[in-house]
Curated annotation (Swiss-Prot):
InterPro entries: Cys_synth, Cys_Synth/Cystath_Beta-Synth, CysK, P-phosphate_BS, TrpB-like_PALP, TrpB-like_PALP_sf. Belongs to the cysteine synthase/cystathionine beta-synthase family. Pyridoxal 5'-phosphate binds at residues 78, 183-187, 278. It comes from the Bacteria. The lineage of its organism: Bacteria, Bacillati, Cyanobacteriota, Cyanophyceae, Synechococcales. Induction: Transcriptionally induced in the absence of sulfur, requires CysR for transcription. Part of the srpG-srpH-srpI operon. Pfam families: PALP. This is Cysteine synthase. It comes from Synechococcus elongatus (strain ATCC 33912 / PCC 7942 / FACHB-805). The gene is srpG. Its EC number is 2.5.1.47. CDD domains: CBS_like. NCBIfam families: cysK, cysKM, PRK10717.1. Keywords: Amino-acid biosynthesis, Cysteine biosynthesis, Plasmid, Pyridoxal phosphate, Transferase. The modification N6-(pyridoxal phosphate)lysine is found at residue 48.
């Protein structure tokens, strides 16, 4: 990232430096400290801004982008929005494939940034979106550049270079437990590499996945992978991403749809943090750990991937809006 004087060269350069905020009321006097990394403060309001910028910068540096080239990528929403804001800032055409079950706000944001959106069957999840993107790229390989967020090494690398050092600096190296939902695997892999390998601190790295689609747990147990539908947008892709380094994952916590929604609502109402469903899942796991006696006195850092505004049309806010007599937008 670079600046000219006191201003940034373009909006993609403004990623990172997100705040770390202590959770208070939601933790209910647990013996551990829980700190939330608020990734919704990134320029397009999610943790994926980091990888969106990093993957495009990397493609530019490797000479993959230029006249006549277009980006193509599968997304559950946040990566697509991140790529869209960077592509707009740098003048690159972008096509995105996304399951039709993702929130309406995400689709509107993508259109607002000028991206072309191709919807895929919701029942096929991210696997269907990935296959559709691969088919489009293969149909005209001289035109399309597929960034492949699930296997692109620039993804975990940007977290190793930025997110990890930010957490380390802001905690003064006092982090004991990292809690992160797993979508592409880039966040937990990159942050864990930095803290465990670069700083040499043996933290407990905890992956969070949907209870209804526990493929990481199945993989670690040597069981056949049996993904299932769930409502926690942004995590639980239904397969093991290449960017997820399981050797760095010490524990897996499974969270139900209901827990994720309940904790996302509590974050807004008890901590003043309007948060997405995957944030609720991560915090549900973090609070669970914080309440365990073996973690007394420890510092838990939980990554909150995005902001809640892009979920206003989902089940996350249904009950609240109905109680207030408000129509879901």
């Amino acid at each position: 990232m670079s600046t000219s004087g006191t201003f940034f060269a373009d909006n993609s350069q403004t990623i990172g430096k997100t705040p770390l905020v202590r959770l208070n009321r939601i933790v209910k006097g647990a013996p551990a400290t829980v700190l939330a990394k608020i990734e919704g403060r990134n320029p397009a309001y999610s943790v994926k801004c980091r990888i969106g910028a990093a993957m495009i910068w990397d493609a530019e540096q490797r000479g993959l982008l230029g006249p006549g080239k277009e980006l193509i990528e599968p997304t559950s929403g946040n990566t697509g929005i991140a790529l869209a804001f960077v592509a707009a800032a740098r003048g690159i055409p972008l096509t995105l494939t996304m399951p039709e079950t993702m929130s309406l706000e995400r689709r509107k944001l993508l259109a607002a940034y000028g991206a072309k959106l191709v919807l895929t069957e919701g029942v096929k999840g991210m696997t269907g979106a990935v296959r559709r993107a691969e088919d489009i790229a293969a149909s005209d390989p001289d035109r399309y550049v597929l960034l492949q967020q699930f296997r692109n090494p620039a993804n975990p690398a940007i977290h190793e270079q930025t997110t990890g050092p930010e957490i380390w600096e802001d905690t003064g190296g006092a982090i004991d437990i990292l809690v992160s939902g797993v979508g592409t695997g880039g966040t937990i892999t990159g942050v864990s590499r930095y803290i465990k390998q670069t700083q040499g601190k043996p933290i407990l790295s905890v992956a969070v996945e949907p209870e209804a689609s526990p493929v990481i747990s199945q993989q670690r147990s040597g069981l056949p992978l049996k993904p299932g539908p769930h409502k926690i947008q942004g995590i639980g892709a239904g397969f093991i991403p290449e960017n997820l380094d399981l050797s760095l994952v010490d524990q897996v916590e499974r969270v139900s749809n209901e827990e994720a929604i309940a904790y996302a609502r509590r974050l807004a109402q008890e901590e003043g943090l309007i948060s997405g469903i995957s944030c609720g899942a991560a915090v549900a796991a973090a609070v669970r750990l914080a309440q365990q006696s073996e973690h007394a006195g420890k510092t838990i850092v939980v990554v909150l991937p995005d902001s809640g505004e892009r979920y206003l049309s989902t089940a996350l806010f249904d009950g609240i809006f109905n109680e207030q007599g408000l129509a879901v937008v």
